[in-house]
Amino acid sequence: VWLLIEVADTTLELDRGEKLPAYGRAGIPEVWIVNLPELVVEVYREPHLAGYAQRRLARAGERISPAAFPDATVEVGALLER
């Protein structure tokens, strides 16, 4: 697994509080949480035992790329459309 994507509308507490630390412990290198209520994509990198060392917020109008595939860009606004 190079990238795991969670789409969260009502599950943000579960995704951040339980799943994210578990993904970090499992060594998943990158997690994106598509945060629909706040209209951002939370990008987590650098896994460790407690979660992730790096967190970045990306908003509509920005482009993001998985660290493992930097040439594959995604328009954040497209991920946030309902």
Residue ranges and their predicted role:
Residues V1-A26, I33-R82:
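C-terminal interaction segment
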